[in-house]
């Protein structure tokens, strides 16, 4: 049974993460095409379950739903009108500026699903929390992620040099921010 729908866009839906989603998250997290750009360590299913209980960010599964997705479905999905393609999370929203994290399975990179998913998450943050801004980080070598943030109006705010050892090299973390008024203005200009 899929988790509750939190937000829907033109093509993607954000849903709550449920226990049945942990195998998908663990398999995706083990994929080097996802793990290395994010700088994440390998974790087993139990570590995913424990981690989610402790950190409890607003984590959402990114899904494609409805007609047109059957060729993309895996054998482990009960609902054949739903395809899990990634995750968007919001951390630290209760006590400081919220930080977004996101990833999609490599098969859907370049299709615009990431931009739509992150936009839905930004909208969620500004509707749910009384915060003046939202932040996100991307490693300096992750050009696609940096372009995604900039396309939504995020502004580079700083660089944490040699922040983490990722994929055989020390990588800088580029920090981005988006003010509430910038988001509201961008949304209003699209109407």
Which sequence ranges carry the predicted segments?
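GNAT-family acyltransferases
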Residues: 1-110, 170-191
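Conserved hydrophobic/aromatic "anchor" residues
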Residues: 12, 17, 124-126, 154
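Short, solvent-exposed alpha-helical surface patches in well-structured domains
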Residues: 24-27, 36, 116, 120, ...
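Conserved beta-strand edge residues that scaffold enzyme active sites
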Residues: 43, 91, 139-140, 163
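Glycine-rich beta-to-alpha transition loops that act as phosphate-gripper elements at the mouths
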Residues: 65, 138-141
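Conserved acetyl-CoA-binding loop-helix of GNAT-fold acetyltransferases
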Residues: 103-104, 110-127, 143-151
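Conserved GNAT acetyl-CoA-binding A-motif
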Residues: 128-137
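Conserved catalytic-core motifs of GNAT/GCN5-like acyltransferases
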Residues: 137, 155-171, 188
């Amino acid at each position: 049974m899929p988790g509750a729908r939190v937000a829907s866009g033109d093509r993607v839906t954000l849903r709550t993460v449920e226990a049945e989603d942990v195998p998908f998250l663990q398999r995706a997290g083990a994929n080097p095409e996802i793990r290395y750009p994010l700088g994440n360590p390998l974790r087993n299913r139990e570590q995913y379950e424990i981690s989610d209980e402790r950190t409890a960010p607003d984590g959402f599964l990114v899904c494609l739903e409805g007609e047109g997705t059957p060729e993309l479905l895996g054998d482990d999905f009960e609902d054949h009108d739903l395809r899990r393609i990634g995750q968007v999370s919001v951390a630290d929203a209760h006590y400081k500026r919220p930080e977004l994290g996101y990833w999609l399975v490599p098969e859907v990179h370049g299709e615009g699903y990431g931009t739509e998913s992150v936009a839905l998450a930004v909208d969620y943050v500004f509707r749910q929390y009384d915060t003046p801004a939202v932040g996100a980080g991307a490693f300096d070598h992750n050009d696609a992620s940096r372009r995604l943030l900039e396309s939504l109006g995020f502004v580079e705010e700083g660089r944490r040099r040699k922040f983490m050892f990722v994929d055989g090299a020390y990588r800088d973390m580029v920090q981005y921010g988006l003010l509430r008024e910038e988001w509201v203005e961008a949304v209003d200009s699209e109407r």
